[in-house]
């Protein structure tokens, strides 16, 4: 299923489709179909322009983020752990510090929740050999003994499964000084997890946790909002002008839709 999602995602990627339109136009030019070639190239320009507009991103991100309003860390409920979805922090074994990328707000928000006393441990998922997430978390004041590594997951489905295994597979969450549980594997309540990820990724992440880790009560703690800054901003011409950064973000939103509906409809 993961390979199918990746294949479909590659085919439906706006960059791939745009290059396909250009390739068709080149074939038509070789075949001396001048009028068709012009129409094809105009379509390619319009296609890339649309997917490069910042305002397109707000249209795409809004449906993904609308169910997860902003919540202050201080107002979040207490839980047994903070599940931190990876992808926002990079690193290198040749460099001693974490390198921040788009989505680094995730690690910041996880540390913010921990410092607010909302859970005793943070479980970063998809941690690479360079352990960049740990480097950033410790820089933000989280001690190493409050970080429980999950290093095997390669996608969001495995994130959910392996976080579940960490919480339930070694005696229950009581060993983590759980603030919400009194008994190991309590039959009347579930371990609680604050799920931290980008707001546009939350819909898919929450679906995966509820499907593949039903033993866990998952509470969304979204951050890194993309549509929110547009909510009250007046129209500006730059919103409809091409921007390479907007093109990359819009590609990632399409990836979220494919990932979510691919699992929901075909798994």
Report each predicted region and the residues it spans:
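A structural signal for short, hydrophobic/glycine-enriched beta-strand patches
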Residues: 49-239, 243-246
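Membrane-embedded alpha-helical segments of integral membrane proteins
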Residues: 1-29
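Extended, histidine- and acidic-residue-enriched regions that form the cofactor-binding/catalytic faces
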Residues: 15-17, 54, 267
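Hydrophobic alpha-helical segments of integral membrane proteins
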Residues: 3-8, 56, 60-64, 254-261
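Structured C-terminal subdomain patch of bacterial secreted/periplasmic proteins
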Residues: 241-267
């Amino acid at each position: 299923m993961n390979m199918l999602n990746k294949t479909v995602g590659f085919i439906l990627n706006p960059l791939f489709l745009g290059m396909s339109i250009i390739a068709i136009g080149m074939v038509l030019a070789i075949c001396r179909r001048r009028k068709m070639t012009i129409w094809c190239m105009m379509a390619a320009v319009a296609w890339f322009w649309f997917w490069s507009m910042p305002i397109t991103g707000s249209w795409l991100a809004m449906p993904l983020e609308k169910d997860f309003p902003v919540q202050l860390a201080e107002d979040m409920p207490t839980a047994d752990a903070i599940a931190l979805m990876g992808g926002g922090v990079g690193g290198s074994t040749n460099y001693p510090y974490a390198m921040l990328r788009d989505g680094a707000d995730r690690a910041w928000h996880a540390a913010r929740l921990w410092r607010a006393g909302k859970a005793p441990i943070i479980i970063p998922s998809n941690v690479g050999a360079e352990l960049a997430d740990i480097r950033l978390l410790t820089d933000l004041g989280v001690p190493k003994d409050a970080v429980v590594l999950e290093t095997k997951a390669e996608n969001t489905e495995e994130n959910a499964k392996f976080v579940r295994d960490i919480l339930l597979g070694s005696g229950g969450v009581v060993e983590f000084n759980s603030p919400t549980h009194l008994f190991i594997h309590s039959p009347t309540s579930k371990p609680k997890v604050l799920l931290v990820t980008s707001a546009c990724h939350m819909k898919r992440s929450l679906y995966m946790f509820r499907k593949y880790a039903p033993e866990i009560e998952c509470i969304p703690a979204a951050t890194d909002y993309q549509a929110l800054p547009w909510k009250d901003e007046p129209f500006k011409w730059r919103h409809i002008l091409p921007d390479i950064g907007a093109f990359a973000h819009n590609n990632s939103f399409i990836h979220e839709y494919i990932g979510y509906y691919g699992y929901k409809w075909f798994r």
